[in-house]
Regions:
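Glycine/small-residue-rich loop that forms an oxyanion/phosphate-binding "nest" at active or ligand-binding sites
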Residues: 65-96
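Short beta->alpha connector loops at strand-helix junctions that form conserved
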Residues: 74-75, 114, 140-141, 163, ...
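Short acidic-hydrophobic, aromatic-tinged amphipathic segments that line or gate anion-handling sites
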Residues: 3-6, 70-75, 163-170
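Amphipathic alpha-helical repeat scaffolds
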Residues: 34, 117-124, 238-243
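Active-site/ligand-binding-proximal alpha/beta "capping" segment
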Residues: 185-235
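RNA substrate-binding interface of SAM-dependent RNA methyltransferases
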Residues: 43, 98-191
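Structured adenosyl-cofactor binding patch, chiefly the S-adenosyl-L-methionine
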Residues: 93, 131-132, 146, 151-159, ...
Length: 255
């Protein structure tokens, strides 16, 4: 296994480039950091390409070689140069970008994000959707890149298990789903009490809007139901990920 010592090495430069969206799109790969996340990516069938590891992670690096990766050892300083965090976890690997699920193959229970920009919120909602029993994530224009390190770190492996779909026109996508039998439920401050909403049926999509502006007017028009969580204390609103989690679990409780 080759030992890399220079930050100018092509492998290091290529992996460092995966920290931004343009670099991922150009390379067709994304970065996964840490043993837990790397093992989950492998378990979910993603294709590994390159791995960079400190000496104490060499056993996993050899496993990645067995899975078809080109593995290298490197000092911590180079892991820090590649990592998206201040404290790298000793090993990182590049994987082929997974293809988004086509909207025509949409599953029954979907959470849709309309312009949710915060990577932590996107990843947390993804993870919660997986835990609650939702089957897919639909990302609209303006959302954080689902394959960014920050999103995947917050998703904690759910980003590999729960398929995602993407659309540049959320209202159009929701209209298509509605036409095919999905009930569109949108979280909105103008909506009715969430706990009094009618049963959405088997196929439904829960829409969560951006942290600052909520859902767009066009998305609002595409919804079958507008709902909001009651604020019984002094707070005016909840974090997008918290609100999404409450609604997802309540919707699944009734299944």
């Amino acid at each position: 296994m080759e030992h890399i010592t220079s930050a100018k090495n092509p492998v290091v430069k290529a992996m460092r480039g995966l920290r931004d969206h343009k670099g991922r799109e150009t390379a067709g790969r994304f970065l996964v950091e840490g043993e837990v996340m790397i093992r989950e990516a492998l378990k979910c069938g993603l294709t590994v390409r390159d791995a960079l590891a400190e000496e104490d992670c060499i056993a996993l690096a050899k496993e990645l070689e067995g899975a078809g990766a080109r593995a290298y050892t490197a000092p911590r300083s180079l892991l820090e140069a590649v990592s998206d965090t201040r404290t790298p976890q000793g090993i990182c690997a590049s994987f082929d970008l997974p293809a988004p699920l086509p909207l025509r193959d949409a599953p029954a229970r979907i959470v849709a994000l309309d312009g949710v920009q915060d990577p932590g919120n996107v990843g947390t909602i993804w993870r919660t959707a997986d835990a609650a029993g939702f089957q897919g994530l639909l990302l609209g224009a303006g959302c954080a890149d689902p394959l960014s390190p920050k999103v995947q770190r917050s998703a904690m492996g759910s980003g590999f298990r729960l398929p995602f779909m993407q659309t540049g026109d959320m209202p159009k996508a929701l209209a298509q789903l509605h036409k095919r039998g999905w009930t569109v439920i949108a979280s909105d401050l103008r909506g009715a009490d969430f706990y009094s909403h009618p049963d959405p049926g088997v196929n439904f999509v829960l829409v969560i809007g951006s942290e600052a502006r909520g859902i767009s007017d066009a998305t609002r028009q595409a919804a079958d139901m507008l709902v909001k969580l009651p604020m019984r204390g002094g707070a005016e609103s909840l974090n997008a990920a918290v609100a999404a989690g409450i609604m997802m679990y309540e919707l699944m409780r009734k299944r």
